[in-house]
């Protein structure tokens, strides 16, 4: 991902304030609610029968935290996202058979959740930088797909 020095600084500064536990669970939960077909990849998560069930599900929250911890690693390696996410790409492609379009959807949901949490601090410039990052991460995660 090509970011200017200002964009990198904006992304890093905001990310330092993110509560990964809270935002991760909320982002994954919103993905599962807004795009219910994505739930098929989470059969082992138990009750996903309603928005309240999804948002209160401890397995959704735990996996959301795991997802954002991986995203944090990506932010530390913006110049090598493909390398950073190579193993996760392989796992999601070969073993889990996740539709790579879902990575884009989750990235966009994450941007919305960040905007909701940070309000005016999430300026158009910060949003534009995050859109670049989530697009880069989605591309890296889709890299192993043929």
Curated annotation (Swiss-Prot):
Modified residues (Phosphoserine): 44
Residue numbers of S-nitrosocysteine PTMs: 93
Sequence positions bearing N6-acetyllysine: 59, 82, 144
Pfam families documented for this protein: Globin
GO-annotated molecular function: haptoglobin binding; heme binding; hemoglobin alpha binding; metal ion binding; organic acid binding; oxygen binding; oxygen carrier activity; peroxidase activity
The entry's keywords: Acetylation, Heme, Iron, Metal-binding, Oxygen transport, Phosphoprotein, S-nitrosylation, Transport
UniProt keyword Acetylation present: yes
Domain Globin, chain residue ranges per copy: 2-146
Assembly and interaction partners: Heterotetramer of two alpha chains and two beta chains.
Family recorded in the similarity comment: Belongs to the globin family.
Designated name of the protein: Hemoglobin subunit beta
